[in-house]
């Protein structure tokens, strides 16, 4: 009989998921905006042998009605710092396909994947509040079906980008002056409904592969 394994991660969310958790006497509300606190949590999760440290995201100030602490580090920036202080735990950051361009997201994730030596994953969301959309030159979020359609294309384009430039292209032959073998670089020339991407990504995908993709919820 094959033994099945459960993968466990920790969602580091402010002082806790309950809106009033920050008011508890033992809460760490004063440290929410301190990257050293986030690093401490990630190290604790790594020590406990958890598989991943997961950062959600929200892109507007919420919680005025409850006083809930709702501000965040931008997750990929925070994970860059956390990756240099941890060694084995997976690191998952949240990216909204409603606001990001796939080329930008793929580059950021590729950079983090190499900085962390292959430990980065991305939680792809479509966002859920109009107040977020209004920070990105929109009046409201598109209908859910359109957001999911865009997200599907977003993910497909990122995957194509990660396949467009791999380490096999790197030659670095000093005598001949050849740095890259362009046979291994494949510009996308992509024309889709939501995205148009002409070239290849300019960060090579390492031999240990692309970032892992997740969808929470």
Predicted features and spans:
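N-terminal beta1-alpha1-beta2 module of alpha/beta enzyme domains
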Residues: 1-85, 208-211
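Internal, glycine-rich beta/alpha segment that forms the wall or movable "lid"
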Residues: 4, 101, 106-217
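Active-site beta-loop-alpha junctions enriched in small/polar residues
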Residues: 13, 58, 96-98, 125-129
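The substrate-binding groove and active-site-proximal loops of carbohydrate-active enzymes
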Residues: 25-33, 65-69, 90-100, 141-145
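Glycine-rich anion/phosphate-binding loops
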Residues: 29-38, 99-111
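Hydrophobic residues within beta-strands of alpha/beta enzymes
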Residues: 53, 91, 120-122
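Short His-Asn-centered micro-motif
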Residues: 56, 94-95, 215-216
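Glycine-enriched alpha-helix->loop->beta-strand junction motifs that scaffold or abut catalytic
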Residues: 85-88, 116
């Amino acid at each position: 009989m094959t033994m099945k394994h459960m993968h466990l991660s920790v969602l580091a969310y402010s002082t806790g998921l309950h809106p009033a958790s920050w008011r508890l006497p033992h809460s760490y509300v004063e440290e929410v905006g301190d990257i050293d606190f986030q690093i401490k949590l990630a190290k604790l999760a790594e020590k406990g042998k958890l598989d991943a440290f997961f950062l959600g995201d929200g892109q507007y100030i919420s919680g005025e009605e409850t006083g809930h602490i709702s501000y965040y580090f931008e997750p990929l920036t925070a994970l860059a710092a956390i990756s240099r202080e941890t060694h084995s735990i997976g690191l998952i950051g949240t990216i909204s396909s409603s606001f990001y361009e796939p080329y930008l997201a793929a580059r950021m994730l590729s950079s983090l994947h190499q900085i962390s030596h292959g430990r980065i994953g991305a939680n792809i969301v479509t966002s859920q509040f109009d107040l977020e959309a209004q920070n990105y030159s929109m009046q409201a979020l598109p209908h859910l079906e359109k957001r999911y359609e865009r997200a599907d294309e977003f993910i497909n384009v990122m995957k194509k980008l990660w396949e467009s430039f791999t380490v096999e292209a790197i030659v670095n032959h000093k005598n001949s002056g050849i740095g890259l073998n362009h046979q291994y670089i494949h510009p996308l020339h992509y024309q889709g409904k939501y995205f148009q991407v002409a070239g290849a990504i300019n960060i090579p995908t390492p031999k240990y592969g692309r970032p892992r993709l997740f969808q929470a919820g």
